[in-house]
């Protein structure tokens, strides 16, 4: 999220203005929180359960659709937020969520002192899976991720949006056991922005002296330099994330400074001073070719997504890999908000091209049966929701995942 609060007023004001442009809520009936039984509800049928994530603008709760018995994710934002953005994010999801790889959005409406957005519940994030795999992915896994995410980002861009929040925490696999459990999904459009003006239908103008928006570890060099972001910056940030997965860390992690501003300056300086050849040393040349291409793009230029995809699909085929969705975490127990799941390795994997088609997202399998005492949304669901204290983010990432991460004392994360 926008971590430079002292210098990020422009972005926050922009978010306020944009959020006011869309006032239509979901067609579902609106229902305030609380019922005669004291259970916290969103709309007519979504029961609010335990907290499973948090962010700078609110928190994430596990929920349940009482009509279908399906679990959902419920994102909450205080109505009196100084920089409301949830309705804007809801609008972006409505623009996007008719394709594979974007979670379905089910509802937007009030929940007591909060606005609530109800989303499809997904599985672990790539960061969680990275931990599960001892913080290194094989080339095969990175290429399967990269091929899908280039397609995801291309789709976002075709909807006149730039994403501006690339990081492993924002890319999730489907919920284990669902039809899309092996697809990589993109979530959290709180920092997304329209790069095509809806009035003029023209590309936004090039600007400088912009506040930093995104995650410092992965953001593009031009973002560090205060330049307005465009399509090229999303793709460069993806390239940095791909190298993070292959290397296990990036050269600009772990830098120390007296202030956050100085730290982000050091990250940007180190990023610029690290030659692409050094960053990608000992890895296939295609990784360096990708980064060279996206860094040379003009601000207004439309990237050649097919070229970038072909770079990786050709490398994938030459390496003798099969696109069988057997990632490095295949067969490992996956933690979810409703318990650990032991996924099955796909016996009849879909063809690679299916991950790139913009087909309608399928609903998750319902959790059949009556509600019981083991239901994570049943207990303490009438507990008050405490808005997280507004604190300055002290590192490049924030907590924003679909389940709580286990703390590891032996490892310093997000340096």
From Swiss-Prot:
GO cellular component: cell cortex; cytoplasm; nucleus; plasma membrane
Record flagged with keyword rRNA-binding: no
Compositional bias annotation for Polar residues: 20-37
One GO process term, biological-process aspect: Wnt signaling pathway
UniProt note on regulation of activity: Stimulated by estrogen.
Comp. bias intervals (Basic and acidic residues): 1-17
EC number(s) reported in the record: 2.7.11.1
Active site: residue positions: 165
Family that this chain belongs to: Belongs to the protein kinase superfamily. CK1 Ser/Thr protein kinase family. Casein kinase I subfamily.
Name under which the protein is recorded: Casein kinase I isoform gamma-2
Origin species: Rattus norvegicus
